[in-house]
Amino acid sequence: MIEVKNLHKSFDGKKILEDISAQFLSGKVNQIIGQSGSGKTVFMKSVIGLFRPEEGQVLYDGRNLVDMSGREVKKLRQEVGMLFQGSALFDSLTVLGNVMFPLEMFSNMTCKEMEERAKFCLARVNLLPEKHHLYPGEISGGMQKRVAIARAIALNPRYL
């Protein structure tokens, strides 16, 4: 379980997060929703250790994120799949390449295994093989979202 307790974060003296607490259960789809500019991205970047909270704790299975080594934090980031409002796809990569990207960065898979895993994830979101060679600008916004979902599940994260 990821447990966030009383998180506070400011930038340039402006409070972005104030006394935020939440729990994320492994194997469940967790959602953070709110108005534009409400701090959702800052919150999630704090949860995965990209931002250090000024106050509060982020606990992974009871261990405080700030007490973990860089290697441990990197491993934890692989266990959290995140989707944002924008699809955040790489325009220079094909649909298949976008889904393979996290596998190339964080897995020990062979090229063939990465391609098979990416194709499996794309099939799970009903993106047909004839779309795999296309670039994000060549597919609809809905298809782009599905590619982003496939990429988020590619590493089989504990938390989504």
For every predicted segment, state its role.
Residues 48:
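Helix-to-loop junction immediately C-terminal to a conserved catalytic motif
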Residues 93-101:
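Short coil-to-helix segment of the ABC ATPase nucleotide-binding domain corresponding to the Q-loop/switch region
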Residues 134-139, 143:
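Conserved ABC ATPase signature
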Residues 63-64, 112-130:
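Conserved ABC ATPase "signature" region
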Residues 56-64:
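Conserved ABC transporter NBD signature motif
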Residues 33-35:
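The feature captures the beta-strand-to-loop junction immediately N-terminal to the Walker
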